[in-house]
Amino acid sequence: MVLNANTQFQNSFNEDLFDSIKNPVKTSSDKEELSNSIILTTLNDFSNWARLSSLWPLLYGTSCCFIEFAALIGSRFDFDRYGLVPRSSPRQADLIITAGTVTMKMAPSLVRLYEQMPEPKYVIAMGACTITGGMFSTDSYSTVRGVDKLIPVDIYLPGCPPKPEAIIDAVIKLRKKVGQETYFERAKIQSFHRYFTISHRLKPTYSVEEQLKAKELISNRQENLTISKKKIKESEEIFLQF
């Protein structure tokens, strides 16, 4: 009698069919149940996975860069696939996107929004005007030369304005950064990052030459005051003699 592969397969199939009819409810072993119901991971990896998949941004748009970000909401780019849900309250957001020029009068409100966001929080500086002040950085007396002077920035996105594809790339890089964080590093970053508080009042700074001129004027005024005091004393002494 010659057995080929087909007859062996048919015999094994008949045995499996007989076993299924004999015992229709199979009981799986403990090892199979444990392997199918247990996930081995760390607390850092699990929390990072949950956070990077649900970044809720707060949109702080002040100029034309914000229009490019609004293009992501459409069906062409569909930023919902990255878990981005725009929020109108800073208390519900963990990401703030600054897009546009930031003036000194707007700086306290930006810092207040950043302080009201829960930890951990992230910042994306979008556009040349936000990063360096842009074309307003040379002659303007009321423009902040970079939003990183007010709040710590995690991702810099240059451009005037940057394209929606670049914004998606910045979000992907931020997701990679969030996925590699640990609790120790997060606490270290929070203590390292310092930013202006609400009580701080920004004032325009003067050049070095103007500061030197102001010091000379103050010193000349003090010298004139001392000379005038001496003359007054001399005149009083002369008057008392007569």
Curated annotation (Swiss-Prot):
Kindly list the cysteine pairs connected by disulfide bridges: none
* Keywords attached to this entry: 4Fe-4S, Chloroplast, Iron, Iron-sulfur, Membrane, Metal-binding, NAD, NADP, Plastid, Plastoquinone, Quinone, Thylakoid, Translocase, Transport
The entry's localization annotation reads:
Plastid, Chloroplast thylakoid membrane
The protein's GO terms of the molecular function aspect are: 4 iron, 4 sulfur cluster binding; iron ion binding; NADH dehydrogenase (ubiquinone) activity; quinone binding
User: What organism does the record attribute this protein to?
Assistant: Chaetosphaeridium globosum
Give the UniProt record's GO annotations in the biological process aspect. Answer: aerobic respiration; electron transport coupled proton transport; photosynthesis, light reaction
Q: From the Swiss-Prot or TrEMBL record, give the protein name.
A: NAD(P)H-quinone oxidoreductase subunit K, chloroplastic
The reaction(s) this protein catalyses? a plastoquinone + NADH + (n+1) H(+)(in) = a plastoquinol + NAD(+) + n H(+)(out); a plastoquinone + NADPH + (n+1) H(+)(in) = a plastoquinol + NADP(+) + n H(+)(out)
The record's similarity note reads: Belongs to the complex I 20 kDa subunit family.
Q: Does the keyword Thylakoid apply?
A: yes
Task: State how the cofactor is bound.
Answer: Binds 1 [4Fe-4S] cluster.
